[in-house]
Structure formats: structure tokens, C-alpha cells
Amino acid sequence: MALPSVDTLQLALGSSFSVSELERTNEVSGKVETVLWILTPFLDTKNDAIYVTLRESENSDGNTLLYISDERYASDFLWSIPMFRTQGKKALKMVRKLIRHNNTVLHNGYLFIRLLPEEGKDPVFVANQIKNLTRIILIVTSLPITMSKY
């Protein structure tokens, strides 16, 4: 399985998203991997652009899967929720339910969607999953939660 082409994914996402290809070193394996960097049209609470990445990776069974990953926003926020008050716990339950119903995984500090080889071949399906993850990021990072005192 291969990553969708930049042009095909750009067409499937629409002109408000920006797709570019870059190479980076995987921190775990040390290998250089190709990553599609997707800049969304949305801003986080600090007015920084929200982005997600799309990369190939082999799972423990030896299957190559596509991973759509939020490497910063919702992951950081979700892992800090237990330090918040009661409304934070309610928000976490709501977000976990949302994640379950959108084929999304929260694991080891990352929020991501795994796509099987047959799903990864359809650029429209991939684009819809990117949009689903973006929606979750927007919902999670805009939750009005006040921090408790330590």
C-alpha cells in the first residue's frame, strides 16, 4: 500500500485544506519515512493552524496500515483532562464516546485513525477520515474547562 498522491488527496479534501509531502525520521525505528502533512483551515485556541499527518506504518502483525494522526492538539489536551475538575471528567466521557463512534483511537498519548489497506486506497474515504479527525480535534480543543488548583 502506498500513500495517496498529494494531488489526489488535495482534490478529495478541497481547496480549504493544504497537502504537502515531506520526509522525516521516525523516532522509534530511526528510518526516514514519507509523511503527508495536511494543514487544515482551522485555528486552535492559540490561533495556530491545526494540522494532521498521514503516514504508512507496519503493525505488529506485519500489515502496512495508513495512520491519520493528530500529533499535538487533542492528544495533549485529552491526556491532561484527568487533572481538571468534574466538568473535565464529563468532557472526557463525551470525547471518548465521540472517538469510539468515529473509528478513532487514543493510545500512548496520540489520537489517530488506522486505515486498512483497502480503505487507504480510496482517497475520498481517506479525506473523510481526515475531516472526522479534524472535527474531533476542534471539539476537544474548544471545550470550556477550567483548571483546578493543585
What are these regions (language model features)?
Residues 1-135:
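Nuclease-adjacent, charged terminal/linker segments that flank catalytic cores
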Residues 132-150:
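Hydrophobic, aromatic-enriched interface-forming segments
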